[in-house]
A protein has these predicted regions:
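Short, basic, glycine/proline-bearing loop/turn elements
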Residues: 24-26, 134-138
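Short, well-ordered alpha-helical segments in soluble proteins
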Residues: 33, 37, 126-133, 149
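Electropositive, glycine- and tryptophan-enriched low-complexity nucleic-acid-binding patches
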Residues: 73-136
Length: 152
């Protein structure tokens, strides 16, 4: 390979791809694991899958921002631009691997006055993906307390 694209170039190419187009890739991984018995290693509590839901930031800058960025004011008075997501992952105690599921991005929502948050992303994830993972008989783990209160 003569020219290797930079991470910024790859990001700019992928920015136009809606995340929903990636859903089938996540589904195919889980389906292949189930078909070949790979999910058996992740079953706990009588054959249930543990799905951890936790927020994480994957971009942060004082200089670069986009229309989808969330913002926060720091104590130094500067505005910080960032992107975050709710990661959903099949996990098992004592297992050194995890199976990622489709994330839910924490971003400005159309018509909303307040910024999006991890708790709202968890509600959206559960609404969107509950049926999809139902066969795994999931137990949801709210890593940072997002499931401490009952979600509708």
């Amino acid at each position: 390979m003569a020219k290797i694209p930079t991470d910024n170039h790859i990001r700019s190419m992928l920015d136009s791809v809606h995340p929903s187009h990636l859903q089938s890739s996540f589904d195919q991984v889980v389906a292949a694991l189930r078909e070949k018995g790979g999910m058996n290693e992740f079953q706990r509590l009588g054959g249930r899958a543990l799905i951890a839901l936790d927020g994480t930031e994957y971009f942060c800058s004082y200089k670069l921002g986009c229309p989808h960025c969330l913002t926060r004011k720091r104590s130094n008075g500067k505005t910080e631009f960032y992107h975050s997501m709710l990661a959903a992952t099949i996990v098992a105690p004592g297992h050194n691997m995890a199976v990622p599921l489709m994330p839910e991005f924490i971003a400005k929502q159309d018509g909303a006055e307040k910024q999006d948050c991890e708790r709202n992303a968890a509600k959206r994830w559960l609404t969107t993906h509950c049926e999809r993972v139902k066969a795994l008989r999931p137990v949801y783990l709210g890593v940072s307390g997002i499931l401490c209160k009952r979600l509708p």
